[in-house]
UniProtKB/Swiss-Prot annotation:
This is Large ribosomal subunit protein uL10. The gene is RPLP0. Ribosomal protein P0 is the functional equivalent of E.coli protein L10. GO terms for molecular function: large ribosomal subunit rRNA binding; structural constituent of ribosome. It comes from Lithobates sylvaticus (Wood frog). Transmembrane segments: none annotated. InterPro entries: Ribosomal_protein_uL10, Ribosomal_uL10, Ribosomal_uL10-like_insert, Ribosomal_uL10-like_insert_sf, Ribosomal_uL10-like_sf, uL10_eukaryotes. The keyword Ribonucleoprotein applies. GO terms for biological process: cytoplasmic translation; ribosomal large subunit assembly.
Length: 315
């Protein structure tokens, strides 16, 4: 099959990205630094049936999106984030599920000289198995060692590289000698597009319980503020009613004004002991009946025992 010319390829690419933007309401903008073609193929296969990966030149992606803004103006929010080595992952599935699938497709990678470290790298205390001739190599990196049974032993954990630092040749060589692959590379989610809204991927970690807790906290804050300023809202009205009722009771107690519930409060304040004694009286009345029953049972058992004593072994 003859290869299509560049103009045809561009035209088909524009049609493809526009079709995907129309068919899929959600997508990720992903960074693809240090992702090789073999790993990309594995990612596509693992996402088959769940999501579609589309890579391309930033200028072409921007041009396709700008040409489609008349049909969907919300796509303009994507344009500021199309920079660097990025692509799209389109999906109709749950975003958190697809995110987890992308994370599962990261592969460990060795440190290369000149690469920017995506994370801190710490060399743990260990016996390296390397001969004493490598001691100067560790000393040059400021790593404290000792010779143990003819091999070099690192005495304590050492932070070799910090996030964002450029990996030096010595650091890369040491990590390779120790068979440490400190980095993992894959598609990194940079932004999330969901039905016209765009937000950072950290939002996907917010659970329903966290949302519920934040909502209740907001309701409590609103109720507190409204109570202080005397502004009625749905959140504050129940508290206002209770507080108002307490004030009415207090007023009734201090004046001659009364109503049935206030009468109970006045009676309690006049003679609290009447309410305290009422409960023990009921308990005291029940106590003799309860004690009488065991006494009766005990008497019956005693009579049965006496009857048994009347018969001898040879009667």
């Amino acid at each position: 099959m003859p290869r299509e010319d560049r103009a045809t390829w561009k035209s088909n690419y524009f049609l493809k990205i526009i079709q995907l933007l129309d068919d899929y309401p959600k997508c990720f903008i992903v960074g693809a630094d240090n992702v090789g073609s073999k790993q990309m193929q594995q990612i596509r296969m693992s996402l088959r049936g769940k999501a579609v990966v589309l890579m391309g030149k930033n200028t072409m992606m921007r041009k396709a999106i700008r040409g489609h803004l008349e049909n969907n103006s919300a796509l303009e929010k994507l344009l500021p984030h199309i920079k660097g080595n990025v692509g799209f992952v389109f999906t109709k599935e749950d975003l958190a599920e697809v995110r987890d699938m992308l994370l599962a497709n990261k592969v460990p990678a060795s440190a290369r000289a000149g690469a920017i470290a995506p994370c801190d790298v710490t060399v743990p205390a260990q016996n390296t198995g390397l001969g004493p001739e490598k001691t100067s190599f560790f000393q040059a990196l400021g790593i404290t060692t000792k010779i143990s049974r003819g091999t070099i032993e690192i005495l304590s954990d050492v932070q070799l590289i910090k996030t964002g630092d450029k990996v030096g040749a010595s650091e890369a060589t040491l990590l390779n000698m120790l068979n440490i692959s400190p980095f993992s590379f894959g598609l990194i989610i940079q932004q999330v597009y969901d039905n016209g809204s765009i937000y950072s991927p950290e939002v996907l970690d917010i659970t329903e319980d966290a949302l519920r807790a934040r909502f209740l906290e907001g309701v409590r804050n609103i109720a507190s503020v409204c109570l202080q300023i005397g502004y009625p809202t749905v959140a504050s009205v129940p508290h206002s009613v209770v507080n108002g009722y307490k004030r009415v009771l207090a007023l009734a107690v201090e004046t001659d004004y009364s109503f049935p519930l206030a009468d109970k409060v006045k009676a309690f304040l006049a003679d609290p002991s009447a309410f305290v004694v009422a409960a023990p009286v009921a308990e005291t009345a029940a106590a003799p009946a309860a004690s009488a029953a065991p006494a009766k049972e005990e008497k019956e058992e005693s009579e049965e025992s006496d009857d048994d004593m009347g018969f001898g072994l040879f009667d």
